[in-house]
From Swiss-Prot:
GO terms under cellular component: cytosol
Entry EC number(s): 1.1.1.23
Residues where substrate binds: 245, 267, 270, 336, 369, 423, 428
InterPro entries assigned: Ald_DH/histidinol_DH (IPR016161), Histidinol_DH_CS (IPR001692), Histidinol_DH_monofunct (IPR022695), Hstdl_DH (IPR012131)
Reaction equations catalysed: L-histidinol + 2 NAD(+) + H2O = L-histidine + 2 NADH + 3 H(+)
Class of the enzyme per the UniProt entry, highest EC level: oxidoreductase
Entry keywords, A to Z: Amino-acid biosynthesis, Histidine biosynthesis, Metal-binding, NAD, Oxidoreductase, Zinc
Protein name as annotated: Histidinol dehydrogenase
Pathway: Amino-acid biosynthesis; L-histidine biosynthesis; L-histidine from 5-phospho-alpha-D-ribose 1-diphosphate: step 9/9
Co-factor remark: Binds 1 zinc ion per subunit.
Residues at the active site: 335-336
Length: 445
C-alpha cells in the first residue's frame, strides 16, 4: 500500500498556513488521567511506603512485601552487566565512555566553577556553584526500555558531582531489562527501585519511609508520569515535559535519498505522533526520497508506526533555496536538525533554534541518540527557542556571594536606603543605615 505524505511548496500562496497545520500539536490533558494522578500523589504523600507498595503490586502485577524489597542491590546491576552478550556490552561501555567524555568537557566550559572578585573598598562579590544533593531518574519499563536514556540522564548528573542518584524503573510482571540495569551501573546510579508510574514520581518528590526525597526529577515517561512531573514541579525541579520526538532534515539534494528516508524513519518509528520533515530546494530529489520511502518502508519491523507518523505529521517540503530552508528551520525550532549538504557549516551558521544540529551527510541523528557524546535529552515542540539540551549545568545551582566591607557598607548603604525609602520599605532603609552608622563609629574609634 502506497504511503501518502504531505508535499508542500514554499512558493504556494497558502504555504504558511499549511506548514502551521503540519506543526500543530498540543498535548491534550486527559481529565481521567489528571484525576488519577492527583489522587496517587496525595495518597503517596500521606501514606508513603504503604501507598507505593499498593500501587506497584496492583499496576505491575507483583506481590512484593515491602518497598525495601523493591530496591535492587548493586550486585544485581553488576550481574546484569556481566551477563550481557560481549558485543552489546562493549557497545554500551563505549557509549558510556563517550557520553562521559563529552560532559566532562562540558563541565569545564559551562561555568561550573565558583568565582569572586574584590572591589577597591574591600567588598567581595561573587557566585558559589554547587551540585544538587540528590537527583531522581525515571526510566520507563516494559517494552519502552531505553538504556541510552539512563546514560544520558545519569552521567551528566554524576559528572556534575551530584551527591546521590536514585533511579526508579517499573518491572511489570517482575521482568527486568538487563541493558537498563547495566546502564545504571555504568552511569553511576547509586540506588535503584523497581517502581514506576505516578507513584514513583510521588515517592521521589515527597520521599517515603524507604525512598529518599530528591531535589530534581529527570527522565521520560508516559502520560501519567508527565502529569505527575508537572504537578510536583515546585516541590522539586524537573528536566522538562517532553512532547513527541521530531526531526527536520535540510538537504541540498546531494545525499543518497535512501539515507534521508531512513533518517526520517528514525524518528517516525518512535510513535505515531513523532514528526519527520524534509526541506529541500530540489524537487527531483524530493521525488527520489519519496520513492525510497516507499521501497524501504516494507522492510521496517515498525512499519505501521512509521506509516502512521509520516502520514499524520510528516511532510516533504520544496523550498526556494537552502537559505530559505534555514529560515523555516529557525521558525520550526526542531528537536533534531540534520543539515545534509555539501557545505553544512555554511548553513549551520544560519541556525539559531534547534535542540541538536547534525552537520554533514555522514552525521545521522541516530549517532547522537546513542553514542556521539552530546546529550539526547532535547527540547521539543518549538521550545528550542528558549531551552537547551540536558547537561551538567542542569545539575548545578548558583548562590550569590556578598561580603561588604565597613567602607562598602557606607557607600552601598546610601544607595540602598534611598531606594528603600522610595519603595516605602523603612526597615530595609534602617537596616542599611545602622551599618552605615556602625561603620562610621568604628572608623572614628
Amino acid at each position: 500500500m502506497a504511503i501518502k505524505i504531505r508535499k508542500l511548496d514554499s512558493t504556494s500562496e497558502g504555504f504558511a498556513a499549511e506548514l502551521r497545520a503540519v506543526l500543530a500539536f498540543e498535548a491534550s490533558e486527559d481529565d481521567a488521567i489528571e484525576r488519577a494522578v492527583a489522587q496517587i500523589l496525595a495518597d503517596v504523600k500521606a501514606r508513603g511506603d504503604a501507598a507505593v507498595l499498593d500501587y506497584t503490586n496492583r499496576f505491575d502485577r507483583l506481590n512484593a512485601a515491602s518497598v525495601a524489597a523493591l530496591e535492587l542491590p548493586q550486585s544485581e546491576l553488576e550481574a546484569a552487566l556481566e551477563g550481557l552478550e560481549p558485543k552489546r556490552r562493549a557497545a554500551l561501555e563505549a557509549a558510556a565512555a563517550r557520553v562521559r567524555g563529552y560532559h566532562e568537557k562540558q563541565k569545564i566550559e559551562c561555568g561550573s566553577h565558583s568565582w569572586q572578585y574584590t572591589e577597591a573598598d574591600g567588598t567581595v562579590l561573587g557566585q558559589k556553584v554547587t551540585p544538587l544533593d540528590r537527583v531522581g531518574l525515571y526510566v520507563p519499563g516494559g517494552k519502552a526500555a531505553y538504556p541510552s536514556s539512563v546514560l544520558m540522564n545519569a552521567i551528566p548528573a554524576r559528572v556534575a558531582g551530584v551527591g546521590e542518584i536514585v533511579m526508579v524503573v517499573p518491572t511489570p510482571d517482575g521482568l527486568k531489562n538487563d541493558l537498563v540495569l547495566a546502564a545504571a551501573l555504568l552511569g553511576g546510579v547509586d540506588r535503584v527501585f523497581t517502581i514506576g508510574g505516578a507513584q514513583a514520581v510521588a515517592a521521589l518528590a515527597y520521599g517515603t519511609q524507604t525512598v529518599p526525597a530528591v531535589d530534581k526529577i529527570c527522565g521520560p515517561g508516559n502520560a501519567y508520569v508527565a502529569s505527575a512531573k508537572r504537578r510536583v514541579f515546585g516541590t522539586v525541579g524537573i528536566d522538562m515535559i517532553a512532547g513527541p520526538s521530531e526531526i527536520l532534515v535540510l538537504c541540498d539534494g546531494t545525499t543518497d535519498p535512501s539515507w534521508v528516508a531512513m533518517d526520517l524513519f528514525s524518528q517516525a518509528e518512535h510513535d505515531e505522533l513523532a514528526q519527520s520533515i524534509l526541506l529541500c530546494p530540489d524537487e527531483a530529489f524530493i521525488e527520489r526520497v519519496e520513492k525510497a520511502i516507499g521501497e524501504l518502508l516494507p522492510t521496517m519491523p515498525r512499519q505501521d508506526v512509521i506509516r502512521a507518523s509520516l502520514e499524520g505529521r510528516g511532510a516533504l517540503v520544496k523550498v526556494r533555496d537552502m537559505a530559505e530552508a534555514c529560515r523555516i528551520a529557525n521558525d520550526i525550532a526542531p528537536e533534531h536538525l540534520e543539515i545534509s549538504a555539501l557545505e553544512p557549516h555554511q548553513w549551520g551558521k544560519q541556525i539559531r533554534h534547534a535542540g541538536a544540529i547534525f552537520l554533514g551527510r555522514y552525521t545521522s541523528e541516530s549517532l547522537g541518540d546513542y553514542c556521539a557524546g552530546p546529550n539526547h535529552v532535547l527540547p521539543t515542540s518549538r521550545t528550542a527557542r528558549f531551552s537547551s539540551p540536558l547537561g551538567v549545568y542542569d545539575f548545578f545551582k548558583r548562590s550569590s556571594l556578598i561580603e561588604v566591607s565597613a567602607e562598602g557598607a557606607h557607600t552601598l548603604g546610601e544607595i540602598a536606603s534611598e531606594l528603600a525609602y522610595g519603595e516605602g520599605l523603612q526597615a530595609h532603609a534602617k537596616s542599611a543605615e545602622y551599618r552605615m552608622k556602625g561603620a562610621g563609629d568604628r572608623q572614628k574609634g
